[in-house]
Amino acid sequence: MISFIVIGRNEGQYLDSCFKSIRKAIYENNLIDSEIIYVDSNSTDNSIDIAIKNEIDKIYRLTEIWNAAIGRNIGAINARGDDLFFIDGDMELVSNFIPLVIDDNGNLKYDLVSGNLFQIFYNKHGRIQEEKLEFRERQNSYKKPITGGSFFIKKEIYKNIGGMDNRFWCSEDPELGLRLAKKGVLLQYLPATFIKHHTDVLKNPKVTDLKKGGWLYGNILMYKLNLFNKFTYKRMLFSDSSLIVLIFCIICFFWGLKWIMILYPITLLIRIKFKISKSGFQKYIYLLCRDILVAIMFIPFYKKPIPTANIKYQIIK
């Protein structure tokens, strides 16, 4: 049995399409033994009404504290299925992906699996500005130590790893991926579209990122909790190489090798591929500010996860 777990907060604009896409996948693939669970993060719009109208099997509303990690964990705890599928309320499931991951008996073929995303970007007027595949260059199947926000996973594996760490209000999915990878469970990526994602276009994503502090808090905590995980360093080399160089330079500075500090700005220049344009300069400043803040904020202690028993939620259905 598979449990489809939908999470959302104020996603009424897209939620009906999300539910209908899951219903379509269930019908077209004859997944009779399945259920749909919706966990709402105390929405102020009509999300709950939409879930009720769509006759969702189980509906829960988080009432005091909420984030994506908490929502997914509550859904998993209340799921009857041996296999779980997580999807956000602003996404749609592509029905023809199901036969690639579910066998004739309705069981998940892989321990952890996902596919490509078809991104649909909307401007401030609500009109589609751009549509594209997230990973156009990835044409082959492979394994990687990351999950993303939507994926299929065996419930036993999700339970044994402790689910998502609810301290994270962002970056909860890559952190889960690192812990799973350390246990030998890598995500199987299939080069087929499995999700349509509706999202807004950000005018200045780098500036917004720094202002909200989402990347800073999530990634710092992720790196700190997984400091002795070899997959952490592989991720850092791929996405945060300048941060590694900065840390190395700081260590050398205190050893008296001050001249090595020149390596850091050179690394930044390499990362932006020597662009002399305005966008290149903005990225240079962004990376500089981000890396310095990460290095500083790595030291503080962070609160412990909230015990599941202390999380309050209302059972709507």
Where are these regions (language model features)?
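Short, well-formed alpha-helical segments that are part of the catalytic scaffolds
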Residues: 11-26
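Membrane-embedded multi-pass helical conduit in multi-pass membrane proteins
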Residues: 244-306
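Short aromatic/hydrophobic "clamp" motif used to bind/position activated sugar donors
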Residues: 84
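Glycine-rich, basic loop-to-helix element that forms the pyrophosphate-binding segment
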Residues: 62-79
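A conserved acidic beta->alpha catalytic loop
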Residues: 21, 38-48, 91
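Catalytic core of nucleotide-sugar-dependent glycosyltransferases
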Residues: 193, 205-231, 288-302
